[in-house]
Amino acid sequence: MENETLKERFLGTIFGQAVGDALGLSTEFMSKQEVDRFYPNGIEDYSQIVQDDHRRRWQRGDWTDDTDMMLCILDSFVACQKVDILDIARRFKKWMMNGGMGIGRHTYNVMALGDYTSNPQKAAEIIWKMGKKKAAANGAVMRTSVVGLLKDNVANNAENICKLTHYDPRCVGSCVIVSSIIHALVFEDRILDEEDVIGIAKQYDERIVPFVDLAYYEGLDSLCLDDEKSMGYTLRTLGAALWVYWHATSYKEGILKIVLSGGDADTNAAVAGAILGAKFGISQIPEEWRNGLLYASMLHDKVQNFYAMYR
């Protein structure tokens, strides 16, 4: 692939995630009815984000924990010039200890275990088993986009980085699928079809398959993204991302559909945004959304440093 296209998609992936995350905060935890009430004319800009008790914790144009944790992974790749699982775990823990705003309950419980930084995957397994192997939250898939930008061993690295906090095979499969999709877009200009994705899903957990089917054959509403009891389920987030991957005709169209669906909208839009950014490139992300990010220049520098590893 041409270097310019590769760089476009590299930047598109990371900015796509950050923009989706920052815009998704506008409707996070809202039902579809609440979204329609607070944003009767939709949303076009960070300045429109309502300032309630939850949202006012972030400045408009800031991203949340989804992108913070993804950047812990990116920073580790750059600092170590390789994948170092324990270094990533240390960065996660440091982020948590320095505020970790927006951190999910499951992620917190795993990282709060005493020897987390020396044996993170064991900590994740312990917490998962303590919860009777039921927990399959979206706290790992939300940060996995950058793993798709590695040149090789994408599936293996996505598995291992997922298991730093989320041990359930539904989480692991979600991460491998999203990272593989991004890798195929960025490095091969290739779209994975439904059979490809189901092939990956079946290696991890059969329960992933129905969500792949919904995303491929049905409307976005079929995924019930604002379901009050399970909006943070990894397979809802995966389904939303797959839906825009296969059906959205532009970055903007795809992101707004996800954001206006409510539920765990910042995470759904972060993952969907990374995939859409990888597909369409950074130039197709509306300029006001890119430049409106609070830390746009810092983000650009970080991506440049990561991209430089490929020279």
Where are these regions (language model features)?
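Structured, active/binding-site neighborhoods that engage oxygen-rich ligands
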Residues: 1-311
